[in-house]
């Protein structure tokens, strides 16, 4: 019974991965086509394209790990192989989280309205701030990789140079739990906190702007209010998805009887996989150009389908 549930869980994750590939691939394709057509690309589209690439990389890495765990569940992996697996997981997750945080930071600096001189200074240099934030994140990536490699070197020696590639094994679960502690509690929490901060500051900016409108007896929405609401709608979904992702990934760290159950671990992984896949759908729906293109593609597919079905019955 446990084996059947694990297979179902793996199947659901694979479906989520396929949806994520299509969603993020669509973002990359549309933005690249507009880039070629117009011979220029905006900063927000650069971030969106890079974010979509990082999500494709993350989902591909997760898919490879799942496939390998199913096909080769009882083989021994060497120190180098463990490091390669962990490096790709850390790197893909790092850029996925930090690029999403940079996107939120970009929206915040572009749309929020504060009279503070520091904010005004950063607002005028929004592109440099975003680039600097992304470059600074590479320092955290280096430290993260260094700490985890040191841990792997120390632990693999205790396991006589090899580790069983079996995620149902208590030894393997304990080994990867410490890696989750280092990656999630220390490093992934930084871009997560940045995203939450920009989201809260956007809400505060909208509240202040709304108060000013009431003082001037303006009841209708202006352009700035609409921009706030549009971005907040996208960011609310991102905050919810990232919070669920962070929560269920962090739950695998807890040392209790529930976390010794491999089925609960699989459930956490299934829920966590919703974030990189579901967020791509949110980004498509929140961007006017991407949404219109997506609806045009759906209309074209529907039109082709209505033409194809009668021909099929005529045969």
Curated annotation (Swiss-Prot):
Keywords: G-protein coupled receptor, Glycoprotein, Membrane, Receptor, Sensory transduction, Taste, Transducer, Transmembrane, Transmembrane helix. GO terms for cellular component: membrane. One of its GO terms (molecular function) is G protein-coupled receptor activity. It is found in: Membrane. Residues 1-9, 68-101, 150-185, 255-266 are extracellular. The chain crosses the membrane at residues 10-30, 47-67, 102-122, 129-149, 186-206, 234-254, 267-287. Its main location: membrane. Gene3D superfamilies: Rhodopsin 7-helix transmembrane proteins. One of its GO terms (biological process) is detection of chemical stimulus involved in sensory perception of bitter taste. Glycans are attached at residue 170. It is a multi-pass membrane protein. It holds the Pfam family TAS2R. Residues 31-46, 123-128, 207-233, 288-315 are cytoplasmic. Several bitter taste receptors are expressed in a single taste receptor cell. Belongs to the G-protein coupled receptor T2R family. Putative taste receptor which may play a role in the perception of bitterness. This is Taste receptor type 2 member 129.
